[in-house]
């Protein structure tokens, strides 16, 4: 039975209420946020410009869109910022209004919600445990002329796996030939060093929509900032007109402008994930009764080999919150997602997992 009402991670208020403690007493591994925290440059800019909240934001977000355009080396007219990438998901779904769409499971729940709101027929393509939850070329056969849209999360959430570029290109080519809009959710791609995603390929592929997030990499989930990118200026302009005015607050827009210039922060994050991610993965693999999938983002998918062990409940008693994946289509109560955090925080989770799993054998 689910512990919480929320369908997402990061629900520390409800988890803390279950324990009868303050939320700041809980160590949260359920939300995939950069543990280095907000860049100092962003924090300083917000503090120095607090008076901007006394004015309406620029309705066109000119400076933010220019900063994003410089960052990706594309025209600003290709970009539409939103109140977190989740808004961009709903914006592109309502703007394209597909009649039939495929979403890959397990995957982010908001694709289905956004499509359901517009009455779209949803077909689910299930990743297989036998394939290590990796996307294979079998999906190409599911791309048929009656489809309007395909949602892909690259890297996938919750598996953290990134499909091979050759396969993604084959999918993009088939979608183009069949006039299918390909929506690529690249919310976590910034965590993968030197991985540019599909934005550089958009010029000749107006059927591809790339969704990005600044929330996770720059640790600003409370501000909310995401954006979509597409090379069809007219289509983006149409969505811009349909978007709610002032959907991005002034502080979030400023944070985005400043964060994108902080290359030192990017390098520091890559260094942390390269070192700590590998160490944490290896340490988890040494624990009994756990299967750990080698994701490339800042989180890992785990499977507990004992269905009667509720790791989320057990760890919560030690004031640690992890993400149960039982509500992901295609997964069940054996699966969990954990963020990769600082070395000290990861050690605390490892110690708690040892306490739960050590001494328990499959024969018990």
Curated annotation (Swiss-Prot):
It catalyses: O-phospho-L-threonine + H(+) = (R)-1-aminopropan-2-yl phosphate + CO2. Pathway: Cofactor biosynthesis; adenosylcobalamin biosynthesis. Its cofactor is pyridoxal 5'-phosphate. One of its GO terms (molecular function) is threonine-phosphate decarboxylase activity. It comes from the Bacteria. The modification N6-(pyridoxal phosphate)lysine is found at residue 216. This is Threonine-phosphate decarboxylase. The gene is cobD. Belongs to the class-II pyridoxal-phosphate-dependent aminotransferase family. Its EC number is 4.1.1.81. Homodimer. It holds the Pfam family Aminotran_1_2. Keywords: Cobalamin biosynthesis, Lyase, Pyridoxal phosphate. NCBIfam families: L_thr_O3P_dcar (TIGR01140). GO terms for biological process: cobalamin biosynthetic process. It comes from Salmonella typhi. Disulfide bonds: none annotated. O-phospho-L-threonine binds at residues 8-9, 32, 157, 323, 337. Decarboxylates L-threonine-O-3-phosphate to yield (R)-1-amino-2-propanol O-2-phosphate, the precursor for the linkage between the nucleotide loop and the corrin ring in cobalamin.
